């Protein structure tokens, strides 16, 4: 009986299984269909997915697709540039995709307003930081590096929290600022840093940035007038949304940094061998027995962290966003560190059915720097005797803190027991240079602004916009140097440098937007006033602990300063569109600057731009493969008044230094001296012509643009030498000449692969720029030049760069080296270029320049399901560098390795060169081609969503990722790093290679 029951149950189960299978089979159907756009053209490569599953396919070249689905399923069809469609499943489906108007109407922020991307007439590029880039940048400038044609970003060096040199289409000036104007949420920022803060971009945490817009040509920048000759970078930060439930985001990372490359100097064993080769058994002084790698003593593997938390949300009419950030960035040079705390608040309330809108922004940053004495540390590590130990407990070294140093006996101090001191003319212990100097800076910066926008009830086309904003920043750098130190032995040093700045800005403008049939008008007029104030002082002293008296005191009253300048402006803009095809933009701005005398105070800066949407013409409207084609033409004039001195046109007296005092009895009083002035100073003016073509194919799957430009700057401002006795100084700021930049830019963005599971985004840009000085006021003398650039290590304050007519700014100005038949330089033998029978300064010539002729950038991002992989590359061609390291070591004779009773190290490269230091440092031999290909970063990530999801909780989404920054450089340049902003490669703080692990979460 039991057996019968069992068989009966098995039979029932089999029958049930058969019916279930039949039912399931009945639900499964084959879906066939075609996807077209609104013009009836097939959409190739559209994604067709069963909603809520991984089942899907893509359309073929005719727009057809086929897949299996169940009755009741929803089919989701999507493609780039179209609105996604969700449709119930059917055996035969005809899907029509409509253009995504949000993409077509994408708005780009420009000066004092915004415009549809499709209606822009100037050379403007906007980028939105990718969600997949979160956490891999600690500075806003990193987001621009290699991403935009015509924009060069070179970090100053590897210093934690260090700034960067940003150039848009080369420099437009010689001595005035070449930095672009930075505008953050509508407020133009003073780009001059203070102690502890590199520049205005340090103010913004990269995680808070929504978009970066770069205005490149004068037709786009002229609305900013005299502050826009070098382009404009507009940063818009993230904001909340109306009615949005609160959401919390977190981004965090930990990173490990190390040196990518080190200088190749002789080891202790190699140095002893070479010394024996030079002197034999007649060494001028004993060598040590150690084998110290001094670079190991100053470099380290550094661990850094970064955290950022934000809360977004919005009540009915009050969107809000609050964010906090903390960065702890340890440098690869021991003791160096940068800590940054940022906070930002945005409120955007609206009233009267959105007729009255407010936008309130407040940002705060506190930065704490611990600076390493990089010059002393790296210079010492490359020069000090490698046969000596780091520390010594011998008696003389108690006066150097137990660190081994080259020392001399002394009786020059008041304490008779202090019998030894450091030899000031010898290389110093690099670790002591770091550990015996505590150099810290603390800075606070607050930026806030309130925008009010009112759309008139009786005339909704008319808007009134008013804004008031300001910045307050303070920074103090405190330097404490031990009395056991190399440079301040016995006395030490304790001093402060304090700086303050506060700026105020307010503007008001009215805007009228009206459409009349085929005519669209956008008219704006307004005014603005900006005030900039700076003040500060220095104070400090050494201390004689034996006599209890100060030494070499620097007094606040001798160093205190205060300065200010004001800019008053009036501006207007007209945008006109006919038939949504023909575009016209005209702007005008008048600036009055307090930096010039009343006769030269005002500058006029107009611009004009034309645009033609060729794609909208009837002869191209039906060419579906072409999604965009627009021609742009622009002309404009911008100005420059950022000359560093607010009162260069006024006769002023300034306080002398402490060495120029006058005695009255037993008291010494500070004196004042007249300062050079030039009441004829006037504006630099830069005129720019631009022609561009924007294109798009396959409904935006391929987009790009090409631009050609010509820019000429007249009345260049520069500090030049003047005849003795003609003014109160040997140098004075003057308008000295003209400078030209012209070039081409090309950029392209593509999605080569778009499938259900895999997408590939690729961006490439290339820039060619030519820079040339066309006029200097030195007359017609072909040999006239203006000395420029940084000093090199050898010589007496020697510079090897110059401004000269017919050549690029900051070109190298050197002697032409003579070589033997083997290609080796013949020491102290140069070409007599002027043919006068002797080698003199007239034989120097212009040879190469630091700025590259061609810049390129490539970014690749791939996504496969939840995984992503990306990398960024940058290249520079024909940028040249003065190889200061080799030049400084290029004396491997006995006098080069031993002088002032101390040994100095050298390199194998210098030994092979075999020079003996007879003045070759101004030779073109040391100007090296530093073209390079650099990989900025490589990232692998994994995204997840709906983690811990419940019926009442949406779950947690996020991403984990691993990044390596600066993994490799390909270059023939033998120095530490081919990317040198000044062109003089003189022991900079090395750029690190960094390994980073990060986590992003959305709650």
Curated annotation (Swiss-Prot):
Mediates transport of starch oligosaccharides from the surface of the outer membrane to the periplasm for subsequent degradation. Interacts with SusD. Induction: By maltose. Its main location: membrane. The keyword Membrane applies. Residues 1-26 form the signal peptide. GO terms for molecular function: starch binding. Disruption phenotype: Abolished ability to grow on starch. PROSITE patterns: TONB_DEPENDENT_REC_3. It comes from Bacteroides thetaiotaomicron (strain ATCC 29148 / DSM 2079 / JCM 5827 / CCUG 10774 / NCTC 10582 / VPI-5482 / E50). InterPro entries: CarboxyPept-like_regulatory, Plug_dom, Plug_dom_sf, TonB-dep_OMP_SusC/RagA, TonB-dep_OMP_SusC/RagA_CS, TonB-dep_rcpt-like, TonB-dep_rcpt_b-brl, TonB_rcpt_b-brl_sf. GO terms for cellular component: cell outer membrane; outer membrane. Belongs to the TonB-dependent receptor family. It is found in: Cell outer membrane. One of its GO terms (biological process) is starch catabolic process. Residues 243-1003 form the TBDR beta-barrel domain. The keyword Ligase does not apply. Keywords: Carbohydrate metabolism, Cell outer membrane, Membrane, Receptor, Signal, TonB box, Transmembrane, Transmembrane beta strand, Transport. Pathway: Glycan degradation; starch degradation. It is a multi-pass membrane protein. Residues 116-238 form the TBDR plug domain. Pfam families: CarbopepD_reg_2, Plug, TonB_dep_Rec_b-barrel. This is TonB-dependent receptor SusC.
